[in-house]
């Protein structure tokens, strides 16, 4: 692999693709709930497979990995910190020394066609995962890479929504009056801009049941207190942060990688710059 590629910045600080995610540092990588995952058919180990998206490297992407995205699979691993030049074959060849690799994939940026610096592998035997984790350091194409266990996230019911484009002057009473017609409200969050000490133009509403959310989402826009508001499902902070893996995060800790400015393949999985107080809890997708 060329040395030049090693000096280029890489997008590897929080991600999700086809239902797979890298978790915050110190936690196991997870896969999102049904509400957060992109629409795709899923199947058990003995069922069918999902269709691989475009932009895959070295041919077809791992159907078996995609098919098990919402299921626990002890043989599946997330691999972060990959070089742009690392191919699917390179990834498979490296991990084959730990056991038989039945499937692997490298996630690609659909806009640039470049690797996003992370991928997934699926071992035939889960004992191979433990062998990988037992090794203190892994290097591939001149870079320190970071393999972790991949785990499925539980499908919790969706009860929380994001309401954007709301007039900051709209009272909680008016908000509750409008959305209360869809179902019983458990809580309303009114984020404050810490610099201006004023209400922000969005709120989060948690219903006691899941059905009201479905009713609200039948329309994308709602008029609340004279404002045309956009409604979306609110995502847990962990899911939002992982989506930043491929959306502009540039490495912070190279952990022994060449140079300190390139940042390709940062290991700060799940960490993103805060752009607003609402990221403390939820973010729409």
UniProtKB/Swiss-Prot annotation:
**Which protein, by its recorded name, is this?**
Heterogeneous nuclear ribonucleoprotein A/B
Described by its record, this protein's role is as follows:
Transcriptional repressor. Binds to CArG box motifs, single-stranded and double-stranded DNA, and RNA. It may be that repression by CBF-A is a result of competitive binding of CBF, a putative positive factor, and CBF-A to the same or overlapping motifs around the CArG boxes.
- Entry GO MF terms: DNA binding; RNA binding
Q: Give residue ranges for domain RRM.
A: 75-158, 159-238
> Which compartments does it reside in?
Nucleus; Cytoplasm
GO CC list: cytoplasm; glutamatergic synapse; mRNA editing complex; nucleus; postsynapse; presynaptic cytosol; ribonucleoprotein complex; RNA polymerase II transcription regulator complex
Q: Which residues carry this modification: Phosphoserine?
A: 87, 247
* Keyword Zinc applies: no
Region annotation Disordered: where it falls in the sequence:
1-65, 239-285
Is Hydrolase among this UniProt entry's keywords?
no
List, in alphabetical order, the GO biological process terms annotated in this UniProt record: chromosomal 5-methylcytosine DNA demethylation pathway; epithelial to mesenchymal transition; mRNA modification; negative regulation of nuclear-transcribed mRNA catabolic process, nonsense-mediated decay; negative regulation of transcription by RNA polymerase II; positive regulation of DNA-templated transcription
Report quaternary structure and partners.
Identified in a IGF2BP1-dependent mRNP granule complex containing untranslated mRNAs. Interacts with APOBEC1.
Which positions are linked by Glycyl lysine isopeptide (Lys-Gly) (interchain with G-Cter in SUMO2)? Answer: 136, 208
Q: Which InterPro entries does the protein's record reference?
A: CARG-binding_factor_N (IPR012956), hnRNPAB_RRM1 (IPR034846), Nucleotide-bd_a/b_plait_sf (IPR012677), RBD_domain_sf (IPR035979), RRM_dom (IPR000504)
Bias (Low complexity) ranges: 25-43
List modified residues, type N6-acetyllysine: 220, 271
In this chain, where does the modification Dimethylated arginine occur? 250, 275
**Asymmetric dimethylarginine: residues bearing it:** 275
- Give a brief account of the tissues where this protein occurs: Ubiquitous.
| Record-listed Omega-N-methylarginine modification sites | 250, 255, 258, 275
**SMART domains membership:** RRM (SM00360)
List the keywords (alphabetical): Acetylation, Cytoplasm, DNA-binding, Isopeptide bond, Methylation, Nucleus, Phosphoprotein, Repeat, Repressor, RNA-binding, Transcription, Transcription regulation, Ubl conjugation
């Amino acid at each position: 692999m060329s040395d030049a590629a090693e000096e280029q910045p890489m997008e590897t600080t929080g991600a999700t693709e086809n239902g797979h995610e890298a978790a915050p540092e110190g936690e196991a990588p997870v896969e999102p709930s049904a509400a957060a995952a992109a629409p795709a058919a899923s199947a058990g180990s003995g069922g069918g497979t999902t269709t691989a998206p475009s932009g895959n490297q070295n041919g077809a992407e791992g159907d078996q990995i995609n098919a098990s995205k919402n299921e626990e699979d002890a043989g599946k691993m997330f691999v972060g910190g990959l070089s742009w030049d690392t191919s699917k074959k390179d990834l498979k060849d490296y991990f084959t020394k730990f056991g038989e690799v039945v499937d692997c994939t490298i996630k690609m940026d659909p806009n640039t066609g470049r690797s996003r610096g992370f991928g997934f592998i699926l071992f035939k035997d889960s004992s191979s995962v433990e062998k990988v984790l037992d090794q203190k350091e892994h290097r591939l194409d001149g870079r320190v890479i970071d393999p972790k266990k991949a785990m499925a996230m539980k499908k919790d019911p969706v009860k929380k929504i994001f309401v954007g484009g709301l007039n900051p002057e709209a009272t909680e009473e008016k908000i509750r009056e409008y959305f209360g017609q869809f179902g019983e409200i458990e809580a309303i969050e009114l984020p404050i801009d810490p610099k201006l000490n004023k209400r922000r133009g969005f709120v989060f509403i948690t219903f006691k049941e899941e059905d009201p959310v479905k009713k609200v989402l039948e329309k994308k826009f709602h008029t609340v207190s004279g404002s045309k508001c956009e409604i979306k499902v609110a995502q847990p902070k962990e899911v939002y942060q992982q989506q930043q893996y491929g959306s502009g995060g540039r490495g912070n800790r190279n952990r022994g990688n060449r140079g300190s400015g390139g940042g390709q393949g940062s290991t700060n999985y799940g960490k993103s710059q805060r752009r607003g107080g609402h990221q403390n809890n939820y973010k729409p997708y």
